[in-house]
A protein has these predicted regions:
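A short, surface-exposed helix-loop junction/capping segment
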Residues: 31-39
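Acidic, carboxylate-rich catalytic segments that either coordinate divalent cations
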Residues: 1-24, 28-32
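Basic- and aromatic-enriched surface patches that contact anionic nucleotides/nucleic acids
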Residues: 3-15, 38-194
Length: 194
């Protein structure tokens, strides 16, 4: 049995940083080392209107919740903020067009409506990329931890950040709970050992 109280007190290091969108989403090494869709996370569910509203919030400089990561060696896993992370990524890659219905303050500006990131003026692209986002990174203080401890820490962080903030659907909670049952752990361990 994993003693989370001891682990969080003695083994976990928590670091809060402020990172530019540029450093998180245009750095190929960082992108390749970031898993933003771990198995316990729900799928990407934001429609284009909601995604546009979120991007508009960034342009307006409003405070957005931090992205929560778990770091192991040089790899990162998004524990909380998958919808935000993937929306920014899709926008920067040019896969998201800003919809007028999602632009509550910038909707009257022809500089934004119907455009993807690559179609924006250089001024707006630079402004977006320089925007700072808070990140919280959890990691183990040393290399002496088990896979069971790592999985327990990730589940605990995920459950705490998702308890009441943006309620998950019951099937999403069931999925997260299923991933910690003994049978699933057994298969995960044995498949990884092969």
């Amino acid at each position: 049995m994993v003693d989370l109280k001891v682990i969080f007190k003695e083994k976990i290091f928590i670091e809060t940083k402020v990172k530019s969108i540029d450093s998180l989403f245009l750095n190929e090494d960082r992108l390749e080392s970031t898993n933003y869709h771990p198995t316990y996370q729900r799928n990407y569910v934001w429609d284009e209107e909601k995604a546009t509203y979120f991007i508009e919030s960034i342009f307006l400089g409003t405070e957005i919740p931090p992205l929560i990561f778990f770091q192991k060696d040089l790899s990162f896993e998004v524990i909380d903020g998958r919808q935000r992370y993937e929306t920014i990524l899709r926008f920067v890659k040019g896969e998201l067009r800003l919809r007028k219905s999602g632009l509550h303050k910038l909707g009257s500006l022809k500089d934004f409506v119907g455009k993807n990131f690559k179609e924006l003026s250089e001024k707006y692209r630079d402004m977006f990329l320089r925007t700072k986002i808070r990140t919280i990174v959890f990691s183990f203080r040393s290399e002496h931890f088990t896979q069971e401890e790592e999985d327990a820490v990730k589940r605990e962080i995920f459950q705490r950040y998702n308890s009441g903030i943006t309620p998950l659907k019951s099937v999403e909670i069931d999925k997260a709970m299923y991933l910690k049952d003994g049978l699933n752990t057994y298969f995960k361990k044995n498949l990884n050992d092969d």
